[in-house]
Amino acid sequence: MSSLADQLKVIKEKTASVVLDRKARSKIHSRSLIFDPKVASTQDYDYLYQLGLEGLDELSEIDSRFSKFRHTLFSETSVSMDRNVQTKDVISQLDKNIDAFLTLAGPFYSLAPTVKAVEWLVRRFHINMHNGEMLLLTSLPHYNQSVFVKILNVIPKNSFPKIFDWVVGYKDLLKNPPSSSILKAFHNDFEFFKLYAMFLVEQLKNGTVYQEQLSFFLSTTVQLLASLSKSLDTLNENHLPVVLEVVGFLLLPSKYETLRNIDVDTRLTAYSIIAVLASIIPISTELIRSFTESILQDPRSLEPNSVRQTLIVLSQLWRFYQGDFSDREAIVKCFANLAPSKLIKVEHLVKDLVADNYKFQKFLTFYFFATFPNPESYKIFQLVDLGKSELYFSEIAKQIVENSTATDKCRSVVIHICEELLKSNSELFIKALATQEMNIDALEMKLMTTLGSNSSVRDSDDVEFDAGEEDNNDEETEEVAVQFATAANLDSIKSSSKSFFTSSSDSEFSKLTLDLISLLRNVTVKVQKSLLLKFTTSVFSSIETGISFLIRIAFTPSIPLSIRLTAIRCTKWKLKEASTSSSSPLDLYLLIPIFLLGVYDETRVVRAGFVQLLRFIKETTTSIHANKKKVKSVLFMEDVIYDTTEASKRAIISPNDALFFTELLLKEDVLEDVIIDRSRLVPKFGQLILKTFVINQWSLNFFPVVFKWRAWNIVALENKNGTEDRFFFTDSDLSEYFTKRSNWIQQANDAKIAFFEEVEGAIVGLVGGNSTNEAKTATEVDWIIQSLNSQFSNLQIAVNSRLLEIFNNFSTVENRIKIVNKLIDLLNNDEPIESDPMDTLQTLKLDQDLFISVLGNVQIGGQIPEQGPAKRRRRSSSSTKQAMAREDINNMASTHLKKLTIILDLLETNLRNGTETIASPNLLQALFKILTDLDYLGNDGNLPVLYAQEALASCMILSIVKMKNSDETFKFDSNSIRADLIVNSIRSSQSPQVQNRLLLVIAELASLAPEIVLHSVMPIFTFMGAHTVRQDDEFSSSALQQTIAKVIPAVAANGSSSISNEIEFLLTSFVTAFQHIPRHRRVKLFTYLIRTLGSDLSLHVLLFLMGQQYCSSLNKNKMADAQVILEFTSSFLKSFSAIEQLEGISKFAELWDMIPIAELEANSEEYNKLSTRSIFGVSILSLTNSGLSTLRIEMLKYISSVVATENSNFDANTLKTKVAMVLLDSSINDDDEEKKSILGSFRNVAAFLLSSLDTFTNVSRNSEIALSLYDLLANFLNLLPIHYFVDSIFESLDVGKFSDTLSIKVAKNLVILAGAKFESELSSINIDEKIEESVLEKLLPVLLHGIKKNVDIELEQAYLDTFAIIVNKFGASTKTLATPTNSRLLLESLQAITSENCLLSESPETIISSINAITSIVNVLGVKTIGIFPKIVPPSLKIWETTTHSEDEESAKLIQSSIIVLLSCLIKKIPAFMTSSLDSIFITILSSDYVDNSIRTSVLGLVVEHMDSSQVLKSLCNIWCNKKFYENDNTGNIGLYLNTMQSTIDKIDKKSAATQSTVFIKWLIQAFEFRHYSEEADNKFDNNTIHRLESSFHSCGISYVMKLNDKKFRPLFATLVRWAVEGEGSNFSENTEVSRLVAFFKFFNKMQEQLKSIITSYFSYLLDPVASVLTRFSSGQLKDINLRRILLNSLTSSFKYDQDDYWSQQGRFDSICNPLLEQLTNIEEGIGKYLIKSITAFINNVASEEYNETLVHGLIKYISNEKEDNSSSTKIWTIRALKSIFQKMGEQWLTYLPTLIPYIAELLEDDDQAVEMEVRSGLVRVIENVLGEPLDRYLD
C-alpha cells in the first residue's frame, strides 16, 4: 500500500491542470512553444487546432505514420475535449497516443511542423504538465538546439519530472545544457541512465529510433563507461546488464521497414559500445562468443556497407579472448553464420585492415580452426600468422592428422597448408606432429603426396640411401605384400602404354600413381618394395615399361618420398632381373642421361639413389666390355627411351665409349660431391667429353616435364656465360614452347614442380649468350620477340630479365635493332604488359649507331607526300594538309610519333647518364631532320607534337653539350644542321616550353658552332622580345639568359662591325615588350641582359629606350605606367657600379643630343643616318617640331626623375652612396683612376648640360627645355658629396651675376636643393675642413649677399631657409660658428634679417623664413645676440598680435608656430633677459589658438623649467587677476594655463611658495569665483567644463597648501573663511553667500580627504558659521540642497578623521549637536542618507555616556508623539538614524534600549503604515541582531 505522500503526488499530477482561479488558468494557457505568453493567453483552441493540424499534415508528407493521429489527437472532437473531466480509461488511452506521437516526432523536433503539432498537444492536452517525462525523453537528443530550451520553458516547475531535476537550473537560465551536464546526470543517477536506456529499447521495439538518438546514446554511454572504468564493481553490478540488454536489441535484425535506412547506424552503435566495453573491462569467453554469434546472426552485417565495421569489432573482441580450443563446439557455433566463402570475398579488406595495424590474428586463428577443413581453409590460412605459438601449431597438427583422409578437395587444401607450415617453421611443425605420433613421411603417405620441397628437412648427413635390403625379402613381408596385392585386385589393373618416358602417357601415369599410392600408404617400407615389384610385374606387359614407370615415379616430386626411394630400389632390382633373365648381355648405359637428371634432384637421398643406379650401370658395363674382346650385346630400353625418334637422330655412343664414359663419370667418386650439393653437377657436366650423347637424349621432344625441367636447368646454368649446347633444344623445345606451354604447366602442377620458377625460368635461360651461329641466334631473337609479345606475364618478366643479361652478346646490330623496335612497339601498344619496356630500354646499353638506325626507322616524314629538302622558310602546303586529313595516313603518323617520343626519351636518358659516347654530328643531323618532320606533323597534321618537340630539343641540347665537352673536333654539315630550321620551329610552336628549349639549343649551338647561328641572330632576337620575355616562369627566364649569354659572345667573336646595331636591335625588341614582361622578372632580366651585352655598349641604349617608353606613357596619360618605368629604372641601375651608371647617363645625354631639333626631311643625310638605327626609327623621325621638343623635355624629365630618386634613397646601392663611397674614401688617392673617372663623368655631363643650356637659352631658345636641363643639372650635381656640390653651385647663386629671370629660377632651385642636401646629409660625423671651407667661406657669404639684395620674394625665402638650415646644422654639430669671425658674420646677418626686407616685410613667407633664420642664429650665439634683442622680441610679439585677427589662417598658424619656436629658443638661451616680457610671453603662447596644444605645452614646460619659479608664479597670477586671462573664450587655453600653474607649483620650493602665498591666495579666491563669472557671462561654459576647471583649481590649491607650513597657512585659511562667510576680498559684488560657501566647502572637503586629521582643528574657524547655516536650513530660512549635501559631507569627514577628541570638547559638542539633529525635521529625500552618515559618524566620534544620553533624548524628541509637529518623514529619518547607530555602535547602545522600547512600541502602532514598516523591517531587526533575541518580550 502506497504512502500518503505517494497518493498525494498522484492526485497532484492528475489535477495539475485543474484550477478554479481565472488568472491561474490564463497562466497555464499562456505556456507556449511558439508564442509570447501575452499573445498565447488570448488565443482560442480553434486557432491552435488549425495550427497543429497544419503541422501534422506537413509531418504526414515526411512520414505517413503521422496520418493515423488525425483521427485521435488531432480529430475535430479534440478541440472541445477536456482531459480533466475524462474517465481513467480515456486518459490512459490519451497518454498512450501522446507517447506514441512524441516518440514518432523525435527525429523531427528541429522542424517547424513538429513544433506546431506539439504546440497543439501542449495547449490542449497540457502534455507539459501530464506527460513532461516523455516530452523530455523524446527531445533529449536535441539538447543543444533552441527547441529544447522552449520545451524546458513550457514545463512548470511544480510539474517537472523529479528524475530531470538536474536540468531545472538551465530552465531558469533559458540556456541549453552542455553535454558535460548530461554526462554528469547519467553518471550520478543510475536510474536516469536506466530510464533512457529502456526508453531506447522501446524505441527499437517500436521502430521509432533515429540517427540523432543513436548518436546521443552512443556518445553519452561511451563517456559514461569510460568514467566508470575505475569503478568496475559499480559498472558490473548496475550499468553492464543495462548496456548489454541495449546492445542485444541493437544487434537484432529489424522487422520494421522504416528502420532499414538506419540499420547500419544501429549496428555501428552496438559495435562501438562493444568495442569500448572490451577495452575497459575483462570480458568473459562466453560473452565474447555470444557477442560474435549475435553480430553474425544478422545477414546484413556482412553486406558491403557494414562488413568493414563488423570485421573490426570482431577483431577487437577476439583480441581479449582468453580461452583455448578445448570448447571447439562453442567456437564453431559462434562462427556458424560466417561461411568461409563470405570471408574470402572480403579477403582484400582483411588484408587492408591488417596493414592498417588492426589486430586480426587471434580472430582469424580461431575462425580458421572453427571452419577447418573447408575448401576455403587454405585461403583463410594465408591470412593467419601463427607466429611461434606452440599451442597453435599443436592444434593445427591435431586437426591435420584428424583430417588427413578427407575428401580429395579438402585433402588438397590440407596439403597446401602443410607445405606452408613447413616453409614458415618446419621445426615447430615437425615437433607438433610428433606430439600426434606422426612424422613427415607418414603424413605424406596419408596425404598421398610430397609436401613441397622437403630437401631442407631430410637432407642431413645421417640420411643415406639404403639399398641393402634388396635381396632380403622375408616370407612374412612377402605374405603381407600378397595380402595387400590380393585386396587391391592388381590383376584388374593393366597398362596400355609402351613407355612412360613420353608425355602421351601422362593420364595413365596419373591414374596408376593414385592406385599405387593407395596401395602403399599404410604399409612399411619393406612391404612397399614387395608390393611395388608385384605391381610392376602385374600391371605392365614388359619389364622395360615397368622400369620406365618406376623411373618416372622416382622423378615425380608430388609422390611421397618413401615411395620414390622404393621406386629407385625397385628399379635396381628390375635392372638386375632384366640382366639375369636376358639371353644376351644387356647394355644399360642408355639410361645414364636419365639417371644423371636424377642426380640433379632437390633431395639428397634421391640423388644418392640415382648415383647407386649409375654405379650399377658402370658395374654392368664393365662386366660386359672390360675385356678388349668385342661382345655382342643388346641396348636395353632403346625403343622405350627414344620411342619413334629416327635412328639418324639418335646420338647413341658405342659400348666402348660407354665404358669410357662411365669410368670417367664415376672416376674417383666424381659424383660424391654432387650428392652433397646438386649444383656441382653443372661444372662436372660441362667437362664431359661425350655430353652430346647426354644432351641429345635430354632434348627428345616427347620427354615429360619431370625429366625435361632438370635438363633445362642444367644447360641454362651452363649457358650463363654462353654455350652451344643450348641449341640442342632450339628446334625442339623452344620452337614448340608456345604450343606445349599449357600442357607443360599442367604436367608441372601435377608433379608439384614450380613451373614459373623452375621450368619457365630454365627455358628462358636456354636463350641467348655468346655464339658464332648467327642463324640460331636470329631464331633466339625471334623467340625473345615472340615471348615479349605473348600474353604470358610470367614469361614476359623472365624474358625481360634475361634480355638485360644477354643484350650485349648479340653481335649484329640488326638483332639488337629488332629487339629495341619490339620494345618500342610494346610501349606504343595500349595492351597491358607485366614488364616495363621503357625501364628495359633505359637499362640496355645502346650505342650511337643503334640510335641513329632506330631514329632512321621512324619515318614520320616519309608518310607525307611532296616533302622535299628543308627550305629556309617553310610554308604550309595544302597538299600536305589534304594528305594528313586521310585517316590511314594520320593514324600511321600518330603511331610513328608515339614511337619517336619513346626513342627521344630513351636517347635523352642515355645522353644524361653519359655512359657511352653517343653524341655526334651524325646524331645531331638525324635530330634536325626529325625537327622538320615534327613541324609538318604539328602544323599540317594537327598532331600533338609538343612533348616530342620538347624531348627532341632536350636531346639536341645534351648532344651539343656532350660534343662541346669532348676533346674531339667535329665537322658539321651546314645544309642539314641549320639555325633557321630551329627559328622556324620556334615561330610555329605555340608552347613556351618548346620555344625555350629550342632557344637553349641555339644558345648551345652558338658556343659550339657559331657560324651556324650568325645568319639567324635577328629573327632570334625578335622572337625573344616578342614572346619569351613575356613568360612568367623560371624556365623561360633561364632560357632567355642562356641564349643571350652564348649568342652575343658568338656575334662579337665573329668580328662584325655591326655589333652595336645587333645590340640596339635586341634591346629594342625587349623594351618594346616591356609592359608584357612580368613585373617581378624585369630587373633581373634586363640586368642580366646588360651584363651580358656589356654595360659600356648597352646601358645607355636601354636608358634611352626606356625614356621613349616613359614619354609614350605620358603622352597617353598612362601615369601609372610611367611611374612603373621610373621605379624599374631606379631598381635596375642599383645593380651597376657608380662609374657604369655615370657613363650610361653620359652616353644617354649624347643620344638625347642626337634627337633632331627640327623635323627632318625624308631623304636627308641625317634622316638616313638615324633611320638605320632601330633605337630611333620612324617613331622619332616622323615627329614634328613640337613633338621633337616634347620628346626632348620628357626625356630630360625621365632621366632627371631617375637621378632624383637616386638622391632621395639612402641605401647602399644607390648611385649617390656609391659615388660618395669612392670620392670620400680617404684610402683612395685623388689620382686614383676610379675617382678620376667619376669626376670626369660629372664634368662631362655638367659640361654637356651647360652647353645645352646655352644652346636652348641663346641659340634655339626653348625655356622649357632649359628649365628641364637646369633640373637635371641640379639633381645630377646633388649626387656629389657636399663640398663637391657646394663648389659646383655657389657661383650660380651669386645675385650679382643674374642676367634674367631664368637665372633666378635656377638659383632658387639650386638653393632649395642645397638646403635639402644639408638637411639630410650634414651631421657631426661628416663635417670636415673641406665642408667648412666650402660652406662658411663660399656659400654663406653668397647667401647673405642675396638676402641683403632682396631680388625676388621666392628667392629671398629660399635663401633664408637654406641659411637657417646651414646655421642649425653647423651649430648643432660643431663650434665653428662660435668663433669671433663667424660670430660677426652671424650678427651681421641678424642685422640684415631683422630689417624691413625680411622680418618687417609684409610677406608672410618671408616673415616665417626670417624668424626661422633668427631662431637658428640665437640658438648658436645665445647671449651674444642681446644687443639686437629689441629688434627681435618686440617686433615678433607685434607680428603675433596681427595674426590673432588674420583672415589667412594658414599663414597665421605658421607665423604663430615660428614665433613660439623663437620664444622657446630665447627662453632656453637667455632666460634671465626674458623675465621682463614674461606676461607677454605667457599670453602669446596661451593665446596662439592656431598652434597645436602639444607644442604649446612643451614650450610652457620650457618656461617653467628654465625661468625663476617665483617670477613664473607671479606672472601667472598676474595675467589671471590683472589681465583677466580667465575671460579667454577657449577652455583649452585655460586648461593649458592651469597645467602650467600646476607644473609651477610642483616645481616651486617651499620658501618661494611662502613668499608668494598672498598672491596665490588672491588668485585662488578669484579662481573660486570662476563659476560666478561664467554664470554672469550668460553661462559661457557648460557645467561639466566648469566642474573640470574647478577640479584643476582645487588640485592647484591643495598642491600649494602642501608647500606651506601650519603657521603660514592658518592666516591664509582664515582669509578664505572670511571670503566664504562674509565675502571679504570678493572680486564680484554680486557673488552670493551660497555660491561662496559651495566653492569653499568643495575645496575644503578635498583638503580633508588629503590632510585628514591634520586640519580637523581648522574647523574652529568654521564652527559657528556652520552651526548658523545648519540652523537656517532646519528653520527653512535657507534652501539649497547642494550646499546642504556638501556641508553634511564636510562634517562627516571631520568626524571621521578626528583623532584628537576635537569634537568631544563640550563647547564644540553643544555647538553642533542640536543644529545637526534638527536637520531631521526637514531633510530632503535625496540627501537624507548623508545626514544619517553624519549623525552616525558624530555619535561614533563623541561616544560617552553623557553625550550618548543627550543624543538618545535628542533623537527621541523626533520620534515621540509628544512633539506634535513631528512629521512621518521626520520619524522615518530618525528611525533610520537609530538603525544606523545600532549597526555602528552595536552593544554599546543596548543600555539605552529600555529608554527606547516605549517609543519603539509606540512607533509600531503609528497611524502611518510607512513609519510602522520602517520600524518593523528596519530598526527592530537590527536591534534583534545586536540583542541576539526577539524584541517581542520587551515590547510585551
From Swiss-Prot:
SS bond list: none
GO term, biological process aspect, one: positive regulation of transcription by RNA polymerase I
Keywords: Membrane, Nucleus, Repeat, Ribonucleoprotein, Ribosome biogenesis, rRNA processing, Transmembrane, Transmembrane helix
Domain of life from the UniProt record: Eukaryota
Topology within the bilayer: Multi-pass membrane protein
Keyword Lipoprotein: no
GO molecular function per UniProt: U3 snoRNA binding
Gene3D superfamilies, per the entry: Leucine-rich Repeat Variant
Quaternary context: Component of the ribosomal small subunit (SSU) processome.
Record's protein name: U3 small nucleolar RNA-associated protein 10
Originating species: Scheffersomyces stipitis (strain ATCC 58785 / CBS 6054 / NBRC 10063 / NRRL Y-11545)
